[in-house]
Amino acid sequence: MAERGELDLTGAKQNTGVWLVKVPKYLSQQWAKAPGRGEVGKLRIAKNQGRTEVSFTLNEDLANIHDIGGKPASVSAPREHPFVLQSVGGQTLTVFTESSSDKLSLEGIVVQRAECRPAASENYMKLKRLQIEESSKPVRLSQQADKVVTTNYKPVANHQYNIEYERKKKEDGKRARADKQHVLDMLFSAFEKHQYYNLKDLVDITKQPVGYLKEILKEIGIQNVKGIHKNTWELKPEYRHYQTEEKSD
């Protein structure tokens, strides 16, 4: 850091406030396709009964997605994205930029955190289905060789990957944690089939430790505490592709 020279603190001196916003991966990929410094969408900030409501609308010419996971596709990205506002939580967060000459500049201090989420729509559910289908395809494919393969590979009692997997299973009980995005994909796929699940069934479907699974479920789901669906989980409204049923008390 010392070798990079001076640090420009103009942003701190001007007390510039910035927002730290988490956006879906597909949205950042579509932004990257915008020509030059072109417009990517519109941000709307409004007051509703004293509460601040923020939403982002993606430009129509950036809504077409032509590939998913490197494979050709034809689907429209959701255009409407309401924000879920969050507090900074007593943290001091700053934003820096680095120029081509390695000069660091402090652009501002984070005054608001938020998550940009797609509004529930047919486009979003179709996109999720394609992503889930793509992620469920086998990474390795078998291919018949037309000649003898000569290598120096020798059989081993156990591969390093399996050894590491077994070690993780022992550390985390009987189940090893999978990548969070993979677990989310499995959950979305399950909720495509049924609206309600009890935790035991979701554990059987995902093969994940109960504590880890509940952490992820709390981000996308709601646990019903009364009515005919008591003790079951369902998706939060923003992730649903169906109309909400009226629940009995």
Curated annotation (Swiss-Prot):
TFIIF is a general transcription initiation factor that binds to RNA polymerase II and helps to recruit it to the initiation complex in collaboration with TFIIB. It promotes transcription elongation. GO terms for molecular function: DNA binding; RNA polymerase II general transcription initiation factor activity. It holds the Pfam family TFIIF_beta. Gene3D superfamilies: Winged helix-like DNA-binding domain superfamily/Winged helix DNA-binding domain. DNA binds at residues 227, 229. One of its GO terms (cellular component) is transcription factor TFIIH holo complex. Heterodimer of an alpha and a beta subunit. Interacts with HTATSF1 and GPBP1. Interacts with URI1. Interacts with GTF2B (via N-terminus); this interaction is inhibited in presence of GTF2F1. Belongs to the TFIIF beta subunit family. It comes from Rattus norvegicus. It is found in: Nucleus. The modification N6-acetyllysine is found at residues 22, 33, 137. The gene is Gtf2f2. GO terms for biological process: positive regulation of transcription by RNA polymerase II; RNA polymerase II preinitiation complex assembly; transcription by RNA polymerase II; transcription elongation by RNA polymerase II; transcription initiation at RNA polymerase II promoter. The modification N-acetylalanine is found at residue 2. Its main location: nucleus. Keywords: Acetylation, DNA-binding, Nucleus, Phosphoprotein, Transcription, Transcription regulation. The keyword Phosphoprotein applies. This is General transcription factor IIF subunit 2. The modification Phosphoserine is found at residues 142, 248. PANTHER family: GENERAL TRANSCRIPTION FACTOR IIF SUBUNIT 2.
